[in-house]
Amino acid sequence: MTNMTNRLLALALVAFAAATGACGGDGSSAAGPDEAGGSPQFENPTGAAFQLPPGITLKGKILGGEGGDDGNGGDGCQPGARLGVSPTYVEVCFTIHNSNAEDDTLRLPAGLIFISKNIETQNGTQVREEVVVVPGGRDTTVIWELHCLNAHRDPSTEEDEFTIGPVSDHPGLREVIALVAGKLIDQPAASLIGGAIWEVSDFGGLTDETRDALRALPPASAGAAAARARPALRRQRPDKPTG
């Protein structure tokens, strides 16, 4: 990776940390999205409805978690297939059942939104499609690390529940998804992408600097070698406001 690319990544992450109180609000405010600074479209997301394939059904609740790499979600969630790049501020865990005799494929599209039942907890999304093979006649548990969409809300916890929302049609989020299509998404890239989503959801839209940083991400085909050459940058969870 070039020095210019590293510099863009570093500058973007510093800007995100300085500009946001994201995903760490104290949850005490009942303010509406305009007062809190967020986009109304991420409070009540719009877009195409998501449909599970024939024969595949959701079994039980969609539970929240606190994120991490231990392979386990919240209480009541069995270890399962982990999707996304950890750590994040929104984690969901759900079990699906395939009533078909044959294995089937579940495609979770980029921009699919999971909506928290608690309005003090983040909604979440991801920027790339994930694919899960669901064995015929069996249950499969999925633990998915998601980017947060409401900077003034709290990160998810094991006490949260979610519902499956639409595939977002928000122009800003669709732009982020397009910019990172085919890119290598490791921890530094996920931090950069998370900050880009905050810009879209709560700070008026992407800056040109962020667009340049997203374009500069290496292609997925670069693999582990590119990841080793990248700077060890991580988005830190901001402290909660003290007053």
Task: Give residue spans per PLM region.
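C-terminal motif of bacterial Sec signal peptides marking the signal peptidase cleavage site
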Residues: 19-22
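Low-complexity, acidic Ser/Thr/Pro/Gly-rich terminal tails and inter-domain linkers that flank the onset
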Residues: 30-85
